[in-house]
Curated annotation (Swiss-Prot):
Role according to the record: Part of the twin-arginine translocation (Tat) system that transports large folded proteins containing a characteristic twin-arginine motif in their signal peptide across membranes. TatA could form the protein-conducting channel of the Tat system.
Ranges for region Disordered: 48-71
TM annotation in the entry: 1-21
Organism: Bordetella avium (strain 197N)
Cellular location(s): Cell inner membrane
Record protein name field: Sec-independent protein translocase protein TatA
Family affiliation: Belongs to the TatA/E family.
Summary of subunit composition and partner proteins: The Tat system comprises two distinct complexes: a TatABC complex, containing multiple copies of TatA, TatB and TatC subunits, and a separate TatA complex, containing only TatA subunits. Substrates initially bind to the TatABC complex, which probably triggers association of the separate TatA complex to form the active translocon.
GO CC terms in record: TAT protein transport complex
Length: 71
């Protein structure tokens, strides 16, 4: 009684399809898919920026030190 079976979910799906219509549900699905894709692309760009910053910080510069002459 506490959990929903597959039949409960199918009835809910049919009711939602009748209320909103399949075209509206398709639009909602494509909008949701676009949002997920945008989120994934943003995460990949953030990871690429992090690795770029790490490689820039790890560069070494070789220099020679000179003694300062006091006059």
């Amino acid at each position: 009684m506490g959990s929903f079976s597959i039949w409960h979910w199918l009835i809910v799906l049919v009711i939602v399809a009748l209320i909103f219509g399949t075209k509206k549900l398709r639009n909602i699905g494509s909008d949701l898919g676009g949002a997920v894709k945008g989120f994934k692309d943003g995460m990949q760009e953030a990871n690429a920026d992090k690795t770029e910053q790490v490689t820039q910080q790890q560069t070494t510069i070789d220099v020679q030190a000179k003694e300062k002459q006091n006059s």
